[in-house]
Amino acid sequence: MYIKAIMNRHRLLSAATDECNKKLGQACSSSLSPVHNFLNVQPEHRKTPFIRSQSPDSPGQLWPKNSSQSTFSRSSTFCTNLYLSSSSTSETQKHLGNSLPFLPDPSSYTHSASGVESARSPSIFTEDLGNQCDGGNSGSLLKDFLNLSGDACSDGDFHDFGCSNDSYCLSDQMELQFLSDELELAITDRAETPRLDEIYETPLASNPVTRLSPSQSCVPGAMSVDVVSSHPSPGSAANQKSRMRWTPELHESFVKAVIKLEGPEKATPKAVKKLMNVEGLTIYHVKSHLQKYRLAKYMPEKKEEKRTDNSEEKKLALSKSEADEKKKGAIQLTEALRMQMEVQKQLHEQLEVQRVLQLRIEEHAKYLEKMLEEQRKTGRWISSSSQTVLSPSDDSIPDSQNMSKTKASSPQPPLPAENKASETEDDKCESPQKRRRLENIAESEDPKR
């Protein structure tokens, strides 16, 4: 679209070429404004930030040239379409007074020029060509002013440029004004260009072409500069790195290269790139992938270490808990055994007490039997004594004697040993009583006689 706009512009401007050819030499010879010095006074190997960079085959191509001056070996300046505006001097002065309070005065021109020069970035626009055009004095002055090629001058890229010698400072200010208008830049007194990156992202639309009438050839007008870059600069291309998808095959070759270089710690992006030898692979791709590979390699190891540490801690905790449980179980077992021993001792003591009680009971039983036998014996003796005391008369006495004699004469059956023993004891107890009775009986019989 931009190339088409340029072609249309050149077609429109070619119509005004014939009218301005006569005035071009006069304008170039009499209008070497301080802009020429402002643009060309640059150190060697410095380039201006405003250069049209398109393919050489496109129409309307403007190329810088090498300067032939003795003080400067090389300088690149504006190569753009410069033309006069249809606005009047009063309107431009009002416009400059209102919208450009920051533009420098003629006395402080050198300070502003140095400030603008410091803001130029040589890495944004490149390419210098040394084609020169053959012409007269006006053509050589024009080429020194704009560093244009012969083809550019012949094609009519420079049209309707004219101003008087009294408007040097005003033309300088107007040039800066239209430069800022075209680029939509806020050029401050320190020559800062904060919106320079936006120029290369979205190209600006082509400006309408204004032509200067013959009556306005000597009137100081405003200049507009068309600055558009169709190709991104190397700096912006370096900043906008191309993304690349790592396929499994690329990753395998990357891993092999890293292994050959003795691991990811010793491997460098440059060496890995040389070993891989893949087209389109840059050192930035290798560097980022190497960093990711290092992170991916060390993260699982750290996780495994953490897992092992956690497992060891768990094992230690389990072993401690098991040891504590075993100790508690052993203590409980010892306490249970001790209690069992105490219970057994108590049982033995109870058995001994029972045995002693049984012995005592047996002794008491024997003693009671003896007492019962003695009571029986005493009962028999009392009964026999009561019978003897209660006998009725004396007649009965001889009968009793006879009976006793008969009893004594009659044989008696043998008594058992126990009865004999009891009788012997009874006899022993009763013998003194019998004697007393017999004595009493005998005394009673003697007085009767």
From Swiss-Prot:
Composition skew (Polar residues), residue ranges: 381-410
Entry annotated with the keyword Coiled coil: yes
Protein family according to the UniProt entry: Belongs to the MYB-CC family.
Residues of the HTH myb-type domain: 238-298
Subcellular location(s) of the protein: Nucleus
Region spans: Coiled coil: 334-354
Gene Ontology CC annotations of this record: nucleus
Protein name as it appears in the record: Myb family transcription factor PHL6
Disulfide bonds: none
Taxonomic placement: Eukaryota, Viridiplantae, Streptophyta, Embryophyta, Tracheophyta
Region (Disordered) residue spans: 49-72, 301-327, 376-449
Record-linked PROSITE patterns: HTH_MYB
Record keywords, A-Z: Coiled coil, DNA-binding, Nucleus, Transcription, Transcription regulation
GO biological process terms on file: regulation of DNA-templated transcription
A Pfam family the protein falls into: Myb_CC_LHEQLE
Example of a GO MF term: DNA-binding transcription factor activity
InterPro entries according to UniProt: Homeodomain-like_sf, Myb_CC_LHEQLE, Myb_dom, Myb_dom_plants, PHR1-like, SANT/Myb
DNA-binding span(s): 269-294
Top-level taxon of the source organism: Eukaryota
Motif LHEQLE boundaries: 347-352
